[in-house]
Amino acid sequence: MAMAKALLFAILGCLCLCSAVLAARELSDDAAMAARHERWMAQYGRVYRDDAEKARRFEVFKANVAFIESFNAGNHNFWLGVNQFADLTNDEFRWMKTNKGFIPSTTRVPTGFRYENVNIDALPATVDWRTKGAVTPIKDQGQCGCCWAFSAVAAMEGIVKLSTGKLISLSEQELVDCDVHGEDQGCEGGLMDDAFKFIIKNGGLTTESNYPYAAADDKCKSVSNSVASIKGYEDVPANNEAALMKAVANQPVSVAVDGGDMTFQFYKGGVMTGSCGTDLDHGIVAIGYGKASDGTKYWLLKNSWGTTWGENGFLRMEKDISDKRGMCGLAMEPSYPTA
């Protein structure tokens, strides 16, 4: 009996010790995560209105870090990272970054497609318009839902470089403030085709430096010094990655994607593969294509969320997938300006 009691006490003692160790470890982990959150806040200049908001955001941050680390522990072609969206739930991210961004077209008027007869077998295996000086540095749209303007401007910057030899950073804010009499509504969303229509009617755009980005809607400023123009625009045949390849081989192309998934929210690098939606809500730019070291074919894309997102602001998504709409719907509504 005495031995049995001694054994019971020993077991209870071990259990209490284990519980204490686990509790201490959890406290230590929480303290380390809190310190990480503080460093993240300092990095991104995040300030909360009170302690309650900070505590709530810390819990969201902690859950997102757990998701990122769990995903990265799996077998994937790409990986995620803790970025500027780490204290946002996915619902908040969708509302802030994608729900007010690209507005899918309800009726697309048929246009010509000048690359229809291009021999796809004669196209280069790899294209990267950055190496040709046709891509300006990564920009950041902030909390304004005007991805459509950044996409249209980036495509225009590309064709202007290819037609004139000059790479000019053009003004997204001019579109945000002045292109408001149709589908495009500044920070509330728009679409690239309508942006191209406005640019044509407006006689072009001025420079970024002459009409700086403000990340907010403002009154249209009268500017008469447009420095670059386009003659028209064309839509790439929908749901056709081969046609999109023909276009991208010749110039940067505006595309729309479903950017609301958590893997898109925290994308850090590699070739994005797997399932994703096709509810188009975000405008970006296809600036090339290629093949990864493991043989996965990809599209190279420029985003407008700053350099801390993705591969220094850029993204690679799997190319030529079985779904004709393309990865995240990128082949559904591509278009490009003409010069």
From Swiss-Prot:
It is found in: Vacuole. The active site is at 147, 282, 303. Low expression in mature leaves. CDD domains: Peptidase_C1A. Its EC number is 3.4.22.-. Residues 1-23 form the signal peptide. Keywords: Disulfide bond, Hydrolase, Protease, Signal, Thiol protease, Vacuole. One of its GO terms (molecular function) is cysteine-type endopeptidase activity. Induction: Accumulates progressively during senescence with maximum levels at late senescence stages. Induced by abscisic acid (ABA), ethylene (ACC) and gibberellin (GA(3)). GO terms for biological process: leaf senescence; programmed cell death involved in cell development; proteolysis involved in protein catabolic process; response to abscisic acid; response to ethylene; response to gibberellin. It is an enzyme of class 3 (hydrolase). This is Senescence-specific cysteine protease SAG39. The lineage of its organism: Eukaryota, Viridiplantae, Streptophyta, Embryophyta, Tracheophyta. The gene is SAG39.
